[in-house]
Amino acid sequence: HDALPIFMITVPFENINVQNKIPISVDINDLYNKIVIQRRGGFCYELNHLFATYLEHKGFHVTRAAATVYTPNGGRSPEGSHMSLYVNIEGTLYITDVGFGDLPTSIIEIGSKTQFIPTYDKNGVYRAVWINDNQYALQKLRQNKWMTLYEAHLKSQSIKDFEDKISYNEHHPHSIFVRHLLITQPQSFGRATMTYHSLTLSNDSTKHKYDVTTNNYKYFLKKYFNLNVSIIPFEP
């Protein structure tokens, strides 16, 4: 239970290597070097594969699950392109995803078909519900309505099963990770999120935005994400 919040408040979600056109590797030794030694972050495949491998070494039964993300404007990601994680502890399933940009810093129990167990966090209220016997949905309460963040299949996947999705999100011009910079991490006050244009500091009730420039982006990277890295499009 302690490993997940520690990981999330230490390791940012970020796609800087995609923006810098540095190849993505999900080899576990490369991930350890990047995230633990170099103190970087990554996106879902990197963060969740490393965290799943850690949990497996601790004796947990972890499943890498293919999920489809719902975007706030009503769109959807390519089918199964997000890698979610869940663990089975004595017959109860818990989402242990550390590689999604909007998650609480605690595990989320997937309750029974009739009982939903909300998870309360500085950034909002979350729950996991069954869609059918083979799928679950992660949801967040927004303006008194439960909104689906993603739907995932229970079927176990290997990291190799995501190779085409990783390639899409690393190279395809339609991929959000190719088109945009996204760095986000839980904070003591809520969450910090940075793009090429703005830094947003938010929690469930407030939001403050600041302009990001070539002059201040490294300061923000260090202050909020503990990152010391150049982002090529910011550089002259």
Question: What feature does the model see in each segment?
Answer:
Residues 49, 53-121, 125:
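Hydrophobic/aromatic-rich core segments of domains that either
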Residues 14-19, 232-236:
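Short coil/turn segments at secondary-structure boundaries
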Residues 1-4:
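Short, small-residue-biased leader/transition segments that mark boundaries at the very start
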Residues 19-39:
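Short, conserved helix/loop micro-motifs enriched in His/Cys and acidic residues
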Residues 131-227:
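Acidic/His-leaning functional-site neighborhoods
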Residues 9:
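Glycine-rich, acidic and aromatic/proline-enriched surface loops and short helix-turn segments
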Residues 13, 35, 110:
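Short clusters of hydrophobic/aromatic residues that line enzyme substrate/ligand-binding pockets
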